[in-house]
Amino acid sequence: MLTYETWKENSVSFSEEDETKGALSVLSWAYNEYKDEIVYACSFGVEGMVLLHLINQVNPSAKVVFLDTNVHFQETYELIKKVRERFPSLNIIEKQPELTLDEQAKLHGEKLWESNPNLCCSIRKILPLEKSLAAEKAWISGLRREQSETRKHTQFINQDRRFQSIKVCPLIHWTWKEVWRYVYKHSLPYNPLHDVGYPSIGCEKCTLPVGDGGNSRDGRWAGKMKTECGLHFQ
């Protein structure tokens, strides 16, 4: 088994010459390699809809973890209900932070997402994912290379130093148009906020729509000199 400790660059290769640009091959390898010791961390953005559809073809009972920060858009929670109906066999786990919003406010002050967004992300996203990955050998992410400068060197199989795990990224070669083409082709549900200027959807407190020509991450933590929550730093 390929692990964080035994990982070597280019230790596994995949053909990109298929309709899914290698994604199905990567997922088939991942579930064969890690069996039930791999989880997909899904934010339920549009890339997530593609991955859920592909994962359902490879492993219909796969584990999917959603980091429920308690401050997501209502549209996101409604989408999760639709996904459960569409893919009833998937094991979708809604992971909660240890602190409620009230407890967080008492310890760190009101509106921590404004005063210290890095700490807020750590409490409500990073620590819960750490706990979710503790019993896993690998995890799956929907990162695409064209999303941002920080993601353009992502590989199919990555040594994730942040979580000391293997991170599997099947969609690295997909473009924004290809993601949407797949969603429409398979009539997949998606967050309606995508239709009103939100290419990347996170917590309601820290996500704004993006103007024409903007980077897909521009609406995240606008004005905070921050475009990543910390889950994907290497």
UniProtKB/Swiss-Prot annotation:
<dbReference type="InterPro" id="IPR002500">
    <property type="entry name" value="PAPS_reduct_dom"/>
</dbReference>
<dbReference type="GO" id="GO:0005737">
    <property type="term" value="C:cytoplasm"/>
</dbReference>
<keyword id="KW-0479">Metal-binding</keyword>
<keyword id="KW-0408">Iron</keyword>
<comment type="function">
    <text>Catalyzes the formation of sulfite from adenosine 5'-phosphosulfate (APS) using thioredoxin as an electron donor.</text>
</comment>
<keyword id="KW-0560">Oxidoreductase</keyword>
<comment type="similarity">
    <text>Belongs to the PAPS reductase family. CysH subfamily.</text>
</comment>
<feature type="binding site">
    <location>
        <position position="206"/>
    </location>
    <ligand>
        <name>[4Fe-4S] cluster</name>
    </ligand>
</feature>
<feature type="active site" description="Nucleophile; cysteine thiosulfonate intermediate">
    <location>
        <position position="229"/>
    </location>
</feature>
<dbReference type="GO" id="GO:0004604">
    <property type="term" value="F:phosphoadenylyl-sulfate reductase (thioredoxin) activity"/>
</dbReference>
<dbReference type="InterPro" id="IPR014729">
    <property type="entry name" value="Rossmann-like_a/b/a_fold"/>
</dbReference>
<dbReference type="GO" id="GO:0046872">
    <property type="term" value="F:metal ion binding"/>
</dbReference>
<dbReference type="Pfam" id="PF01507">
    <property type="entry name" value="PAPS_reduct"/>
</dbReference>
<dbReference type="GO" id="GO:0019344">
    <property type="term" value="P:cysteine biosynthetic process"/>
</dbReference>
<dbReference type="GO" id="GO:0070814">
    <property type="term" value="P:hydrogen sulfide biosynthetic process"/>
</dbReference>
<dbReference type="GO" id="GO:0051539">
    <property type="term" value="F:4 iron, 4 sulfur cluster binding"/>
</dbReference>
<dbReference type="GO" id="GO:0019379">
    <property type="term" value="P:sulfate assimilation, phosphoadenylyl sulfate reduction by phosphoadenylyl-sulfate reductase (thioredoxin)"/>
</dbReference>
<dbReference type="InterPro" id="IPR011798">
    <property type="entry name" value="APS_reductase"/>
</dbReference>
<dbReference type="GO" id="GO:0043866">
    <property type="term" value="F:adenylyl-sulfate reductase (thioredoxin) activity"/>
</dbReference>
<feature type="binding site">
    <location>
        <position position="121"/>
    </location>
    <ligand>
        <name>[4Fe-4S] cluster</name>
    </ligand>
</feature>
<dbReference type="InterPro" id="IPR004511">
    <property type="entry name" value="PAPS/APS_Rdtase"/>
</dbReference>
<keyword id="KW-0411">Iron-sulfur</keyword>
<feature type="binding site">
    <location>
        <position position="203"/>
    </location>
    <ligand>
        <name>[4Fe-4S] cluster</name>
    </ligand>
</feature>
<protein>
    <recommendedName>
        <fullName>Adenosine 5'-phosphosulfate reductase</fullName>
        <ecNumber>1.8.4.10</ecNumber>
    </recommendedName>
</protein>
<keyword id="KW-0963">Cytoplasm</keyword>
<feature type="binding site">
    <location>
        <position position="120"/>
    </location>
    <ligand>
        <name>[4Fe-4S] cluster</name>
    </ligand>
</feature>
<comment type="pathway">
    <text>Sulfur metabolism; hydrogen sulfide biosynthesis; sulfite from sulfate.</text>
</comment>
